[in-house]
Amino acid sequence: MLRWTRAWRLPREGLGPHGPSFARVPVAPSSSSGGRGGAEPRPLPLSYRLLDGEAALPAVVFLHGLFGSKTNFNSIAKILAQQTGRRVLTVDARNHGDSPHSPDMSYEIMSQDLQDLLPQLGLVPCVVVGHSMGGKTAMLLALQRPELVERLIAVDISPVESTGVSHFATYVAAMRAINIADELPRSRARKLADEQLSSVIQDMAVRQHLLTNLVEVDGRFVWRVNLDALTQHLDKILAFPQRQESYLGPTLFLLGGNSQFVHPSHHPEIMRLFPRAQMQTVPNAGHWIHADRPQDFIAAIRGFLV
């Protein structure tokens, strides 16, 4: 059975003053609470990729969804930086991608991670674009620290519980059940993992998304996403913290036309928390709008930046 591990990619060298900069961080010690009370969870130094641009323009920050990573937005970030001249930041959430693992996992602590990172990089106030889990993190960040968020884009997610439409618990269980022998070629290991996942997850696009987390470390294939933490805190990830304050900045809820994640019944809560919210639907797109309709996704962001 595969287990998660802390798998790191070596940092690339900088590409000059106008190229991307990369950050790779060591594993940071978690709080003594382990997410179960006691000391407060501490922020982690997140892994990120920053594309250079005009400092006078608000930067665009992309936050990925559950099981994702900053690489989900690589192509879109490059295009957006070229077309708008803005700095574009993509970030790995804790327990995802190249960011450190921690037993602490909640929207409050993921928001705190960003409250530490964004000012350090000199990127505030910024435009925050969050998909799914990243969208909930972005919404909470805007509610808690509105001075950090110039405007907000929540991609196919709303500030309510998501359990009715998601299959994330099934995905976690399927990933934990994968069994791959050591020392196999990468292509063979990926094929075997896909075959085992397919017995539970019929959607090939979802399987391919999950398999981006399969990495080889010392001849063993492991999940780089922290499945233990996700399993323990999945209920928190599918929920959204109760808040009384509102974010008064410009807000766009970008919805997939074929997705059921944002329901009309969510609109009152959306408008309570985000009174300036606009709704825009991308036709023929599912939950992963940026993957299904990348050009429409970019066009929607650019239209909202004007």
From Swiss-Prot:
Biological process per Gene Ontology, one example term: lipid metabolic process
The protein's organism comes out as Homo sapiens
Primary place of residence? mitochondrion
Q: Which disease is it linked to?
A: ABHD11 is located in the Williams-Beuren syndrome (WBS) critical region. WBS results from a hemizygous deletion of several genes on chromosome 7q11.23, thought to arise as a consequence of unequal crossing over between highly homologous low-copy repeat sequences flanking the deleted region.
Catalytic residues per the record?
Answer: 132, 228, 287
Instruction: Report the protein name in the record.
Output: sn-1-specific diacylglycerol lipase ABHD11
The alphabetized UniProt keywords are: Hydrolase, Mitochondrion, Transit peptide, Williams-Beuren syndrome
**Which GO MF term does the entry hold, naming one?**
lipase activity
Assembly, per entry: Interacts with OGDH and DLST; this interaction maintains the functional lipoylation of the 2-oxoglutarate dehydrogenase complex.
- Where is the sequence biased in composition, kind Low complexity? 23-33
Q: Which cysteines are joined by disulfide bonds?
A: none
According to its UniProt entry, the function of this protein is described as: Catalyzes the hydrolysis of diacylglycerol in vitro and may function as a key regulator in lipid metabolism, namely by regulating the intracellular levels of diacylglycerol. 1,2-diacyl-sn-glycerols are the preferred substrate over 1,3-diacyl-sn-glycerols. The enzyme hydrolyzes stearate in preference to palmitate from the sn-1 position of 1,2-diacyl-sn-glycerols. Maintains the functional lipoylation of the 2-oxoglutarate dehydrogenase complex (OGDHc) through its interaction with the OGDHc by preventing the formation of lipoyl adducts.
Q: Which InterPro entries match?
A: AB_hydrolase_1, AB_hydrolase_fold
Cell compartment(s), UniProt: Mitochondrion; Mitochondrion matrix
| Modification sites for N6-succinyllysine | 78
Q: Enumerate the catalysed reactions.
A: 1-octadecanoyl-2-(5Z,8Z,11Z,14Z-eicosatetraenoyl)-sn-glycerol + H2O = 2-(5Z,8Z,11Z,14Z-eicosatetraenoyl)-glycerol + octadecanoate + H(+); a 1,2-diacyl-sn-glycerol + H2O = a 2-acylglycerol + a fatty acid + H(+); a 1,3-diacyl-sn-glycerol + H2O = a 1-acyl-sn-glycerol + a fatty acid + H(+); 1-octadecanoyl-2-(9Z-octadecenoyl)-sn-glycerol + H2O = 2-(9Z-octadecenoyl)-glycerol + octadecanoate + H(+)
Q: In which tissues is it expressed?
A: Ubiquitously expressed. Highly expressed in small intestine, prostate and thyroid, while aorta and colon tissues exhibit weak expression levels.
